[in-house]
Amino acid sequence: MDLAVYVEEIMTEREKMLAGQLYDCGDTELLSQWHKAKDLVRDYNQTDSADTEEKERILNELLGGRGKNLWITAPFYVDYGNNIYFGNHCEVNMNCTFLDDNVIRIGNNALIAPNVQIYTAFHPTNAADRFGKPKEDGSFPFCKTQTAPVIIGDNVWIGGGAIIMPGVTIG
């Protein structure tokens, strides 16, 4: 089977997303996961900062994986959450955004300052590639997107306001 046929006809939109292929971010399965993450993040951001047990419960449900001693200061924002993996002894300061359409892997002893943005998603620069073929109902996919993972190594400090683009490895 031709790779292009396999990607277009066999892979789910989530599989395409994680493989860095063009995918439809308006896919119903992806939207369901996205809405679930938004609800969990809202709950986390509204939980009293002293209620560490509830914050831990939410993070365990939201994130793809995490080590010991993770501290995330609210507010913070994600797309899916389940594509984010933290090592041990990590701290994320307030107002950070993780667009985890692909994997974001953060190593041990990482510090992330306020207002950091980590992006794994990007759009094709050719407008014709951003909008796919019409769906069976005649509508167009919302927008075709691609992704690349972001890897942050052990003992890395990301300074305030940094923007980390798709496909970047630090440390």
Give names to the regions the model predicted.
Residues 1-69, 124-128:
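Terminal amphipathic alpha-helical/low-complexity segments used for targeting or macromolecular assembly
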Residues 76-86, 91-169:
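Flexible, glycine/small-residue-enriched loop-and-beta-strand segment within the central core
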